[in-house]
Amino acid sequence: MAALLKRILRRRMAEKRSGRGRMAAARTTGAQSRKTAQRSGRSEADRRRRVHGQNFLVDRETVQRFVRFADPDPGEVVLEVGAGNGAITRELARLCRRVVAYEIDRHFADRLREATAEDPRIEVVAGDFLKTSQPKVPFSVVGNIPFGNTADIVDWCLNARRLRTTTLVTQLEYARKRTGGYRRWSRLTVATWPEVEWRMGERISRRWFRPVPAVDSAVLRLERRPVPLIPPGLMHDFRDLVETGFTGKGGSLDASLRRRFPARRVAAGFRRARLEQGVVVAYVTPGQWITLFEELHGR
């Protein structure tokens, strides 16, 4: 029995020493982390922004140009995505009737709500913009958005039927690829072009953001056309044509279309759209796609 008690006591003493060692290591690690953060110059706000992929636009003149480019209707509601510190929010409120500012980080949302409490034009919502319901009246969307959520936010906007305009700060390459940069056109842009015009605005240097991102940005604007270039009842057929062309079956756009349409009609469509027979599908402009559609569907 005495031997057993001695073993138990020795084990407990060892556990206590081990626990003190872990606590000391934790204190050392915490101190090292704080020192690392201090050396890197990162504040708590910087770390919070990195968690949510946020890079706030801090240059006032750039903010003002961005809001002017957004050109919100004075009488409409504007939904702002990623309000952050409110630099864009306040500029928007000068120009429109009501701004609903969405900020997913509750810390920043609470600070912005407190800072704008006296302005009846601004409503701050702490939550995910992508989960919000669409307004039942015409509205616009404006925002300096987290780059990682760009595709989801753009999809939300394209599916919002009462949305008049969308003006976003995105990665430069995303804006270029969606607006015919390098004379190439994406499937998404072509498929939505009859109803939505895509265009790129100002390029924004990465140095105007905090934290500083790895790449430059640009302003991307989507504007829903008052009168679609193709009747709404035919949009399904148009998108189906675009899907067929971009699948690449047959080795070329011409060959892909001949799998579904008479060869003579495809040839007539190419002549009317001024397309070479071996054209790469990405180099076909949205306008040429519409011409092809009209020829192939006998319009």
Swiss-Prot record:
Pfam families: RrnaAD. Disulfide bonds: none annotated. Transmembrane segments: none annotated. One of its GO terms (biological process) is response to antibiotic. One of its GO terms (cellular component) is cytosol. S-adenosyl-L-methionine binds at residues 55, 57, 82, 103, 128, 144. This is rRNA methyltransferase. It comes from Streptomyces thermotolerans. The lineage of its organism: Bacteria, Bacillati, Actinomycetota, Actinomycetes, Kitasatosporales.
